[in-house]
Amino acid sequence: MAVKHYKPVTNGRRNMSSLDYSKNLSGHAPEKSLLVILKKNSGRNNQGKITVRHQGGRVKRYYRIIDFKRNKDDIPATVKSIEYDPNRSANICLLAYADGEKRYILAPEGIKVGQKVVSGNNVDILVGNSLPLSNIPEGTFVHNVEMQPGGGGIIARSAGTSAQILGKDDDGKYVVLRLKSGEMRRILARCRATIGTVGNGEHSLVLLGKAGRSRHLGVRPTVRGSVMNPIDHPHGGGVSKQPIGRKAPLTPWGKKALGVKTRKTKKSSTKLILRRRKDSK
C-alpha cells in the first residue's frame, strides 16, 4: 500500500502523509451483522475517574467483530472484500463460508479478493490458513498466535507484525517462537496460528502532520510533569526551567520511571521465556 504525500499548501499539510487505500481496499460498506456500537469511555472507569491518561474525543465508530479463534474447521471460505478497520492498524477481510456464515479476520499480506482460506488440523500451509503450531514447519512466519488452546489469537496482530517458528521440543509439547520484539518463548503446540504476516505494514510510515488528526484518533495531549504544579506531579514546581530535583525520573504516582522491570516476577509463564525482548534505545 503506497504512502501519499501532500503539497505544503497549509502548515498542517506540510508534513502530512496517509495511505492510499484505493488500490488495496474493496470499498464495500462493512457487514452490518458484524458491527456493534463502540461506547466511548475517555479513559474513565465506572466512578468517572481517569484510569488511562491521554484518551478522549475520538470520532464515532463501530466495532467490527473479528474472528481471532478461527475455529470453523474444514469449511472453506472465500475472501469477499478487504476493508479498513478504524479500531486497529491492520486491515480486515470478510470471509464468506460455504455454509453461508460470514466472519471478519485480520488481512494477511498478499491476500486477494476471491482467494480461498480454510482452518483445520491438517490444512495446506498457505497464507490465511489457520492450523495448530504442531503442524506448521519450522521457519514459517505466522500471526494471530494463541497463548492458550482455543483462547483466540493474542500474539502478532498489529499491522506488519509476525512471529517465526524456530523449533519444537522433543516431546512435541511446546513450539519455540521468535516474536517481533526479539523475545523467544515457548508456546503450547496445540495453540493455533495463521500463516503469513499481517498486512498494511506501511502503517508505521504515516505522519499525522497536525494535532487534529491525533485528536480524531482519540489521543489527547501529553503534558510534561516538569511544567505541572507539585501537587500534580513529582517533577512539578520550581521557577522557570529548573531540574526535576530527584535522583531519577518518576511516574505521576511516585514510582521510578526508567530502568525498572515492570513484569511480575511470580508469573508462571516466565519460565517459558527463553530470551527477553530487546530493550528499545
Curated annotation (Swiss-Prot):
Gene3D superfamilies: 2.30.30.30, Nucleic acid-binding proteins, Ribosomal protein L2, domain 3. Residues 261-281 have a biased composition (Basic residues). Residues 12-23 have a biased composition (Polar residues). Residues 1-23, 224-281 are annotated as: Disordered. One of its GO terms (molecular function) is structural constituent of ribosome. Pfam families: Ribosomal_L2, Ribosomal_L2_C. The keyword Ribosomal protein applies. Keywords: Ribonucleoprotein, Ribosomal protein, RNA-binding, rRNA-binding. One of its GO terms (cellular component) is large ribosomal subunit. SMART domains: Ribosomal_L2, Ribosomal_L2_C. GO terms for biological process: cytoplasmic translation. InterPro entries: NA-bd_OB-fold, Rib_uL2_dom2, Ribosomal_uL2, Ribosomal_uL2_bac/org-type, Ribosomal_uL2_C, Ribosomal_uL2_CS, Ribosomal_uL2_dom3, Ribosomal_uL2_RNA-bd_dom. The keyword Chloroplast does not apply. PROSITE patterns: RIBOSOMAL_L2. One of the primary rRNA binding proteins. Required for association of the 30S and 50S subunits to form the 70S ribosome, for tRNA binding and peptide bond formation. It has been suggested to have peptidyltransferase activity; this is somewhat controversial. Makes several contacts with the 16S rRNA in the 70S ribosome. NCBIfam families: rplB_bact (TIGR01171). Belongs to the universal ribosomal protein uL2 family. Part of the 50S ribosomal subunit. Forms a bridge to the 30S subunit in the 70S ribosome. This is Large ribosomal subunit protein uL2. It comes from Mycoplasmopsis agalactiae (strain NCTC 10123 / CIP 59.7 / PG2). The gene is rplB.
